[in-house]
Amino acid sequence: MMARSLEISIDELGPVSLQSKENIEISSMCSVFAESEVISLIAQNKEIADIAHGIHKAIAGKAMSLLKRVGLNPGYMMTGGVAKNPGVVAVLEEQLGEKLHIYEEPEIIGALGAALYGLEKIL
């Protein structure tokens, strides 16, 4: 949704955000309202890289609030498709103050865990 609003591909979103020079805040947690903010920033002629970075900061901020609920313990692993986005990964690593462990093909880790759990239950 956000990549489409910025008229770039989803694969470009992460690398583009790493070129950011201006700190932009996206305050909405709702994706529809956040998209409205993005469209407004585009109308203000803000740089695509800066907007993308703002989007990634909002995503990372939400992840950080969830992490704080369960407790921050060093040695973080990131799974899921978002782990393939270098922009989100960079912001999270900055906020955590350490490197994230990301395995090859992070988007299948949840399914792999579910399969192993299911296998354990039937054996």
Where are these regions (language model features)?
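A short glycine/serine-rich beta->alpha loop
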Residues: K46, K99-P106
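Short helix-capping/linker segments at secondary-structure and domain boundaries
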Residues: L6-D11, K46, L67-G71, L119-L123
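A short helix-loop
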Residues: M1-V32
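Glycine-rich phosphate-binding loops at beta-strand->alpha-helix junctions
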Residues: L67-Q95, E107-G110
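Beta-strand segments within the central parallel beta-sheet cores of soluble alpha/beta enzyme folds
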Residues: E12-Q19, G75-M78, I102
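Internal alpha/beta core interface subdomains
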Residues: A3-I8, K57-G61, M77
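Glycine-rich phosphate-binding/hydrolytic loop that grips phosphoryl groups
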Residues: M1-R4, Y103-L123
